[in-house]
């Protein structure tokens, strides 16, 4: 699902109908982005739509939105890989619920967001190892995994970890 396109339309043009459609068609995804990822406040705050819009008005984030939309104008390859990979996973783990997938732009916060039977892919975290903005914030080892080819493996990994958590995962050596 291309949540990112509605998000981009709202954040680059201020088109309030796009925000309304985000809230109507993707209420959980919108709440997760605004409240949990960006931590801008609650979705019911009277001024949340303006706060959300203003957060992304930074020129760096505006460029990131435009770059992500251009880089991921076509996601057929990723959709195909997700379908094949999660199909195989379903064969290996009978009864595993197939999540729904959506793309978003998350301001370089998290690469994959797991919801209740949904997987959000933050396209801004997969712009390629040589993406200029990444060089300011990430080392070469980190940037190596911030490519299109890591989207499907990351989706598999984080979805499985949400179902089968590992003890003390955050404190394990990489």
Regions found by a protein language model. Give the residues of each.
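N-terminal mature-domain "stem" immediately C-terminal to a signal peptide or N-terminal signal-anchor/transmembrane
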Residues: 1-55
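Acidic/His-rich structured neighborhood in mature extracellular/periplasmic domains
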Residues: 53-174
């Amino acid at each position: 699902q291309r949540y990112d396109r509605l998000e981009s339309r709202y954040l680059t043009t201020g088109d309030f109908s796009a925000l309304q459609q985000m809230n109507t068609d993707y209420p959980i995804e919108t709440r997760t982005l605004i409240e949990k990822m960006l931590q801008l406040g609650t979705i019911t705050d009277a001024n949340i739509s303006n706060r959300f819009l203003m957060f992304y008005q930074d020129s760096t984030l505006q460029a990131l939105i435009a770059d992500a939309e251009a880089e991921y104008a076509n996601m057929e390859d990723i959709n195909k890989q997700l379908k094949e990979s999660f199909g195989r996973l379903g064969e290996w783990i009978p009864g595993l619920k197939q999540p729904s997938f959506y793309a978003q732009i998350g301001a370089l916060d998290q690469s994959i967001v797991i919801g209740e039977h949904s997987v959000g892919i933050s396209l801004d975290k997969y712009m390629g190892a040589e993406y200029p903005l990444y060089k300011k914030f990430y080392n070469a080892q980190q940037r190596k995994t911030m490519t299109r080819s890591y989207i499907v493996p990351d989706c598999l990994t984080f979805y499985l970890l949400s179902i089968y958590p590992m003890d003390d995962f955050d404190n394990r050596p990489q």
